[in-house]
Amino acid sequence: MSQSGAVSCCPGATNGSLGRSDGVAKMSPKDLFEQRKKYSNSNVIMHETSQYHVQHLATFIMDKSEAITSVDDAIRKLVQLSSKEKIWTQEMLLQVNDQSLRLLDIESQEELEDFPLPTVQRSQTVLNQLRYPSVLLLVCQDSEQSKPDVHFFHCDEVEAELVHEDIESALADCRLGKKMRPQTLKGHQEKIRQRQSILPPPQGPAPIPFQHRGGDSPEAKNRVGPQVPLSEPGFRRRESQEEPRAVLAQKIEKETQILNCALDDIEWFVARLQKAAEAFKQLNQRKKGKKKGKKAPAEGVLTLRARPPSEGEFIDCFQKIKLAINLLAKLQKHIQNPSAAELVHFLFGPLDLIVNTCSGPDIARSVSCPLLSRDAVDFLRGHLVPKEMSLWESLGESWMRPRSEWPREPQVPLYVPKFHSGWEPPVDVLQEAPWEVEGLASAPIEEVSPVSRQSIRNSQKHSPTSEPTPPGDALPPVSSPHTHRGYQPTPAMAKYVKILYDFTARNANELSVLKDEVLEVLEDGRQWWKLRSRSGQAGYVPCNILGEARPEDAGAPFEQAGQKYWGPASPTHKLPPSFPGNKDELMQHMDEVNDELIRKISNIRAQPQRHFRVERSQPVSQPLTYESGPDEVRAWLEAKAFSPRIVENLGILTGPQLFSLNKEELKKVCGEEGVRVYSQLTMQKAFLEKQQSGSELEELMNKFHSMNQRRGEDS
C-alpha cells in the first residue's frame, strides 16, 4: 500500500458546496455564520489572555539517541515525516497569558499541558517547508527534565507569525519585566477582528461546466476494451447485449477508485492504531520518572493521542473491509501481478489486527451493512488459508451469508461510504453493485398476474394514466403491501416517502428520482415501490433508497387525478455519458487508474506491474511533482484532458501551490470538475509518496508479527 493511507486528519478533506454555474461561487448565509462563529470562538483575545486554534503535529525529545541534537534536526525530522504523510494532527487550543502557555482540549476545554513561561526556551516559526505552511515551534524544558521537548503546531486559522509575536512579547515581559504585550495584543486583536469580518474571501466567477462529448461522437465509438458478461445479477439491464466499451472502462475506473479509497482508509485506521499504541508506550515511559501527583512532561498531549478509536470508527473500518472484499471479487478479472487472490491475504492481516484490538469479533459481527455478494463469498471460500478461514468464520453470518440468501426483512440499507479524503463515491455505481441488488427482484412489469392487475386498478385511482408495458423486461415482484419500513397509513390518507439517493431509470417502468424529493406511494412491494412524482409521472423505485416522509414534507398536497401537477419532472430515462476524450486519452487514463491501484493495495515491495486486460498503446505520462513550475502544471492538466478553462485557471500555479489546494477550494475555482482535479491530485500525491518510501502497513504488520513471535518465545 502507498503511504497515502497514513494521511492525517487535517483540514482540506471536508466537503464544500459546488461552484455555482450561474454567477459567483458563494457560501450560504448559514455556512458563513457557522464559520465565523467557529473562528470567533476559537481565536480570541481578552485582557491579557489570547487563544488560538492550532493542530499539534509532533513532539520530539532532543536526544542524541533519536538523532535530534538541535532544533534544525527536529525540523528535518518533521519535514521527513510530512513527506511520507506520517504526521497525525490533533486539534487543540493554545492559550497565552502573562504566566504560562496552556494547551486545552478543543471539545471539553480540559487542560492538556501547562508550560510556565520560564520553561519555554524558544519560540520559532517554520514557514512553507512542508505541507503545513504555517508552523509554530516551541522548545520547553522544566526543572525535572534532563532533555527538552520540541513541540510543533500548525496554525491553521491565525498565522504562525502572529502567534509567535504574541508568545515572544509574553516571554520578553516575563524575562525583562517590560510591558510590551498589551500593545502587541491590541494590534493582534484588530487583525483578528478584520479577519473575522472578511471570512470567507470573495470568490471569482464560477467556471463554465465541463462539457462531455455525446455518445454519438466519433471519439465515443469503436473503443477497444475488455469483454463483459452478457448477463449480470440484479436489475442491471442493457438495450444491447454488450455494454459500450467506454462505459465499461468508466465503470471499472469508478470501482477501482472506490477500492483505492477504501484501502486507504483501512490503512489509515491501522496506522492510527499504531500511532495510539506508540503514544501509549511513550506515555508510560514518561510516567515512570515523574513525581507522584505531578504530570509528566507532554503527558496531556500523549494522553489525547493514545485514546483508542471509538466503536463507531471500528464499525466504519469493518464496513470498508467488507466493501473492499466485494470489490476485489468483482475486479478480480482485471487485476494481476499481484492478483486479487493474493491481495486478499494482505487485507486479512489488518482485519486480524483490528479484531484483536477491539477485544474479539463482537463488534465485527454486528456489522451487516454492506453484505457480501455471492461472488465475494465464493471468492473467499476458494482463496483463504485455514487461519484466515477461521477468522472469517468467527465473524458470523453477516460476513459469511451472501446478500442473495439474506432475509428480505428488515431491509439492509444501501451502503455509501464516507472517505477521509473527502472524495464522494458515485452512488449510481453502488446502487447497481451485486452486494446491493442480489436477491432483489427487478422492477415489475405492469400486467403479470391477477394480483398485479388488481394493484394497477387500485393505483389508477391516484394516477391519470397507466404505464406502458414493455414485454419481457422484468420479473414480477412478490406482493406484500404495507409491510416495509413500518408504514401503516389509514385508507383515507396518502402515503409519502423521501428519496435518500439519486436513482436513474433504466427502462420505461422505472422512475428517475433525485435526492430529497418527496413522492407519493402508489404500491409498496417488498423490493420495488411504485411512486408518483409531483409532475404526475409514476414508476418503480428500489425500496432501499427510500426514507419515511410526512404529507407536509411535500410542501403542498399532490393534486387529484385530472388536475394539473406542479414542479419539474424528473427525467425518465438517462443514458450513461461517454468517456470525455479520444481513444489515447481513455487508454492513458485507465493505465493511470490501474497503476494507482497496484500502488494502493499491494504491500509487496518491487512487484511487477499489474495491467487491465485492455489493448492499448503505451502512453507518455506527463510528470507533476512538488518541484514543478507553471509550465509543467499546465502540461499535466492538458495531459489529463481537463477543459481549457481549468487549464487556464490552474496553469498559473506551481506544483506546491496546486498540491496545497483542498477539495473545497478546487470546487470553488473549477466547479463540478474540481472533484476530478482533486481526485487526480490525490492519486499523484500517493504516487510521489510511494516513490520515497516503503509500505507503512507492511512495516506495521512486520512489527505486529514480531511482537507475537516474541510473546510466543517468552511464554
Swiss-Prot record:
All copies of domain PID, residue ranges: 46-202
Biased composition (Pro residues): 199-208
Residues annotated with Phosphoserine modification: 240, 449, 570
CDD domains: PTB_EPS8, SAM_EPS8-like, SH3_Eps8
Principal place of residence: cytoplasm
InterPro entries: EPS8-like (IPR039801), EPS8_2nd (IPR055093), EPS8_PTB (IPR033928), Eps8_SH3 (IPR035462), PH-like_dom_sf (IPR011993), PTB (IPR013625), PTB/PI_dom (IPR006020), SAM/pointed_sf (IPR013761)
Localization per Swiss-Prot or TrEMBL: Cytoplasm; Cell projection, Stereocilium
GO-annotated molecular function: actin binding; cadherin binding
UniProt domain SH3: residue ranges: 492-551
Residues recorded with modification Phosphothreonine: 303, 469
Keyword Plastid: no
Comp. bias intervals (Polar residues): 451-466
Assembly and interaction partners: Interacts with ABI1. Part of a complex that contains SOS1, ABI1 and EPS8L2. Associates with F-actin.
Sequence similarity: Belongs to the EPS8 family.
Protein purpose: Stimulates guanine exchange activity of SOS1. May play a role in membrane ruffling and remodeling of the actin cytoskeleton. In the cochlea, is required for stereocilia maintenance in adult hair cells.
Associated disorder: Deafness, autosomal recessive, 106: A form of non-syndromic sensorineural hearing loss. Sensorineural deafness results from damage to the neural receptors of the inner ear, the nerve pathways to the brain, or the area of the brain that receives sound information.
Protein name: Epidermal growth factor receptor kinase substrate 8-like protein 2
Organism (species): Homo sapiens (Human)
Name of the encoding gene: EPS8L2
